[in-house]
């Protein structure tokens, strides 16, 4: 009872901290202040420890590792986002992932706390299929992989947006030059008059292009490494799940909806990893594959639960709300 009360308190504390961090993030969009950024980072650290305490207290009073239903898996997913957010800070690197990981942690935990029915927050007795030592290994690896792959996919989407905008800018400049070539007589004087202004702008434009190149390179660098980490977790999760399935159901693979979409997810990111071996396919081309993976992950994790069918139906909305 004490730990159940502690979980309830930590849930509300965590949600309150999340609201504060969201407010700070919105302010930083308007005001670039280092102090506000540091405050939001401290808020994320506090959120991480609150979620950790929440998971531990639920583990103690429920008597099993808290990964048995949708509510618990969402808490663990937000904790996984927070872990990824903390990695650059632990290694004393600039936190290039905070733009993705912080909102992901905030919105996932916020939805878990306020978006699900209160009945879904209650701990239930494990179904027989989940009463195994493989629960912690398989489900934790899968959720860590989802968190890493979602973050990497979002970085790839950001890369595509920046690249797409760059292509539009180049196209607009090309059209301007094309039109100008047909009105040389009228524009010759204006071009001479504007040449000095163009020279003054040249340094600024080259700096902006260099900054954009650095940004896209950084996005490509981090998306590849985060997705590679997630792909490793996904592979371990699928293999451990196959061993567990053989123990529980007598077969390594049964092609139920969850397993099928897990295989599709693995295939998509295997293709992504293959594109990274070819330099001509790196950058925007591989980012397109990763962006497709973003939707596939949500179908695998969340969409299949809406069906409530198959061997993995114990994590569906229907069963957890009864």
From Swiss-Prot:
What membrane topology is given?
A: Multi-pass membrane protein
Key words, A-Z:
Chloroplast, Cytochrome c-type biogenesis, Membrane, Plastid, Thylakoid, Transmembrane, Transmembrane helix
Q: Which residues cross the membrane?
A: 9-29, 43-63, 70-90, 142-162, 226-246, 259-274, 287-307
A GO cellular component entry from the record: chloroplast thylakoid membrane
InterPro entries according to UniProt: Cyt_c_assembly (IPR002541), Cyt_c_biogenesis_CcsA (IPR017562), Cyt_c_biogenesis_CcsA/CcmC (IPR045062)
Q: Where in the cell is it found?
A: Plastid, Chloroplast thylakoid membrane
Q: Which GO terms describe its biological process?
A: cytochrome complex assembly
- Highest taxon above the source species: Eukaryota
Q: Name one GO molecular function term.
A: heme binding
Database matches in HAMAP family: CytC_CcsA (MF_01391)
Q: Which family does it belong to?
A: Belongs to the CcmF/CycK/Ccl1/NrfE/CcsA family.
- What assembly does the database describe for this protein? May interact with Ccs1.
Described by its record, this protein's role is as follows: Required during biogenesis of c-type cytochromes (cytochrome c6 and cytochrome f) at the step of heme attachment.
The protein here is known as: Cytochrome c biogenesis protein CcsA
Q: Per the UniProt entry, what species is this protein from, by scientific name?
A: Chloranthus spicatus
Primary gene name = ccsA
């Amino acid at each position: 009872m004490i730990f159940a009360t502690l979980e309830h308190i930590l849930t509300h504390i965590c949600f309150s901290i999340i609201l504060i961090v969201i407010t700070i993030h919105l302010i930083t969009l308007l005001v670039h202040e280092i102090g506000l950024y540091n405050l939001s980072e401290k808020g994320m650290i506090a959120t991480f420890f609150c979620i950790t305490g929440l998971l531990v207290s639920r583990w103690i009073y429920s008597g099993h590792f808290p990964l048995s239903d949708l509510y618990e898996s969402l808490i663990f997913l937000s904790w996984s986002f927070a872990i990824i957010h903390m990695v650059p800070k632990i290694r004393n690197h600039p936190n290039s992932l905070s733009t993705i990981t912080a909102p992901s942690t905030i919105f996932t935990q916020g939805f878990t706390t306020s978006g699900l029915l209160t009945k879904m927050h209650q701990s239930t007795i494990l179904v027989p299929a989940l009463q195994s030592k493989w629960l912690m290994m398989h489900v934790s690896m899968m959720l860590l992989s989802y968190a890493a792959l979602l973050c990497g996919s979002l970085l790839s989407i950001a890369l595509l947006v920046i690249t797409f905008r760059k292509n539009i800018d180049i196209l607009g400049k090309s059209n301007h030059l094309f039109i100008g070539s047909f009105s040389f007589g009228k524009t010759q004087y204006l071009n001479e008059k504007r040449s000095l202004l163009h020279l003054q702008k040249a340094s600024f434009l080259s700096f902006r292009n260099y900054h954009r190149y650095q940004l896209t390179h950084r996005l490509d660098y981090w998306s590849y490494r985060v997705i590679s980490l997630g792909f490793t977790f996904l592979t371990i999760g699928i293999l451990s799940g196959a061993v567990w399935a053989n123990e529980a159901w007598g077969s390594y693979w049964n092609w139920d909806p969850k397993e099928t979409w897990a295989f599709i997810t693995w295939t998509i990111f295997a293709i992504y990893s293959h594109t990274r071996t070819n330099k001509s396919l790196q950058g925007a081309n591989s980012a397109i594959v990763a962006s497709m993976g973003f939707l596939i992950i949500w179908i695998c994790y969340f969409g299949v639960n809406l069906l409530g069918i198959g061997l993995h139906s114990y994590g569906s909305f229907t069963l957890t709300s009864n």
